[in-house]
Structures are given as C-alpha cells and as structure tokens.
A protein has these predicted regions:
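Short beta-strand edge/turn micro-motifs at domain boundaries
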Residues: 1-11, 118-141
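Short, low-complexity N-terminal intrinsically disordered segments enriched in polar/charged residues
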Residues: 2-39, 47
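Ser/Thr/Gly/Pro-rich, low-complexity flexible regions
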Residues: 37, 51-52, 134-139
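Short beta-strand segments enriched in hydrophobic/aromatic residues
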Residues: 49, 105-109, 123, 140
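A short, structured loop/turn motif at beta-sheet edges
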Residues: 92-99, 112, 126-132
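A short hydrophobic beta-strand element
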Residues: 97-107
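Short, cysteine-centered beta-strand-loop-beta hairpins and adjacent loop/turn segments enriched
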Residues: 108-118
C-alpha cells in the first residue's frame, strides 16, 4: 500500500511520488546495530556503515565520518543502553532508490567519568543501495 509523499529538496524525478514500506532488511539491520552498539562491539558495529557517513546530531551539528573513524565511537563510555521502541522502514515507490527508516528509541550513555546522558530519540537512518548506513538525522528531548 502507498502512503505519504516524497517531496525532496528541489524538483527531481522522485518529487511527488508516494512512500511505501521497504523490506530490504532494514529492521533486522537496525536491531543488529542496536545489539552491537549496546555491547560496545566495535567490529560488529562498524559493519553496518558505509565507507562515509553523515551524522546530523540533535544539537544541530553535522559530522562527516569515515567508517574507520567509528572505531573510536565507544572510547568515552562505560556503558550504553539503546532501547528501540519502533522501526518504520520506507522507500520511494516504484524506484530502486536508497531507503530509510524512522527509529523511535531511548538511549542512556554512562561516561567513564560517571556523567550520564539520557534522551528520547527520533532518528532517520538512511541506507545506501548496498544496504549500509550512509546517514543519520537525530532529534531528541
């Protein structure tokens, strides 16, 4: 079933097309990502990412990472608890375009210095045609 509408930035061949649920393994990939992230398993965690990743943080900052940069992701943390609440994978109808998923979650990070970071998150996770994460856009409260 069709629903929603892709508008995009500027006119392009996909502008105005409906969105459909995607079934390219995005749900399983995000569940695996969460498992690796919570275990702070660098090797498994980095396998989910493309060679280059754009991360737009909830605080308005944009970070461009190479996959090799992600090996340092867990360095400041004692523990991480990312709890997935929902995963909605979508793609533009009648295209072979990259897909994305809306992910609602909570996350608690405990730093090695004892400081805690706890947020409710809404993230848009973008997958390239190879099924690797190529971007993330994060909102928090």
């Amino acid at each position: 079933p069709y629903g929603g509408k892709f508008i995009g930035v500027g006119d392009n061949e996909n502008s105005g097309r409906p969105l459909v649920f995607s079934n390219r393994g995005e749900v399983e990939m995000i569940e695996g990502l969460a498992e690796a992230y919570n275990a702070m398993d660098v090797e498994s965690f980095t396998e989910y990412f493309a060679e280059e990743v754009e991360f737009k943080s909830y605080d308005g900052k944009t970070y461009n990472y190479k996959k090799s940069d992600l090996t340092q992701a867990f360095k400041p943390y004692k523990s991480i608890d990312w709890k997935l609440l929902s995963i909605v994978p979508l793609k533009i109808s009648n295209t072979d375009a990259a897909s994305g998923a809306m992910v609602l979650s909570t996350e608690t990070r405990v730093f090695k210095n004892g400081k805690k970071w706890k947020k409710e998150l809404m993230e848009l996770i973008y997958f390239d045609l190879e099924g690797k994460i190529s971007g993330m856009l994060q909102f928090a409260r």
